[in-house]
Amino acid sequence: EPQKDWAPLVRKAVDHAGFLPLSLQTGLSFEVLFGFSPREVQQAFIDQVSGPGVYILEAPMGMGKTEAALYAAYRMLEQGKAGGIYFALPTQLTSNKIHDRVNAFLSRILLQDSPQAPLLLHGKAWLKTFSEQEMGEDAAPGKPWFQSGKRGLLAPFAVGTIDQALMAVIRVRHSAVRAFGLAGKVVIIDEIHSYDTYTGTIVDKLVTLLRDLYCTVIILSATLTQSRRAAFLGAHQPVRTDYPLITAVDSQSDRPGPRRKRKSRKWVLSSTE
């Protein structure tokens, strides 16, 4: 029907697929989002996440690494430097717990006309989401209920296990789709110290890819060895024993043009109080 006005239908189809631009509430403070003032280490980390690159926060449990990462992600979304968030964790259980926290976080920063709920991506995600979703149209063939395994990372916001992102750098079907879904997003990789050598090697490749895709990579860990830190940053780092520790490298040296030495920066907080 060439005479038909397809514009409203196209917008509806794109909206149904979850690809409409985000509508954020701007100017929200850390206190408004989380109900308390940021600690010194949290504020220092938030201040340093200024654009695409790799940012590592090493701090003990209970220091609020998750809140710091989420607020840094909010700042990137607010400034138009990111198009979404993927929060990667080592297990299905931790993914389920963080999914609830990210869901509450998004309900505060997004306007009503934006996609509100983050997808949960892991092998048994349906066990958690089945009771939360009204099936409706999503249960029809071709709708997200059947496609989430292939295109889950295309959603603006998702929480899941690290393997969902690792498949972007492994020779598997739809790896290019997964890489495309991560491009330009804030990718938060939590509990990085918990991965074995095999998984850690693939994570190194993933971080390299994410830098090339102009992602903002936030790595959270209790502690990292010097060699692991250097592998993520792609730059030699002097030995430091300070703790907590914030390490960062931006993506400027990865842009096309004459090759330049990658610049890295460190911020040290000498007290955990």
Segments the model singles out, each with a brief description of its role:
Residues 1-273:
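N-terminal helicase ATP-binding lobe
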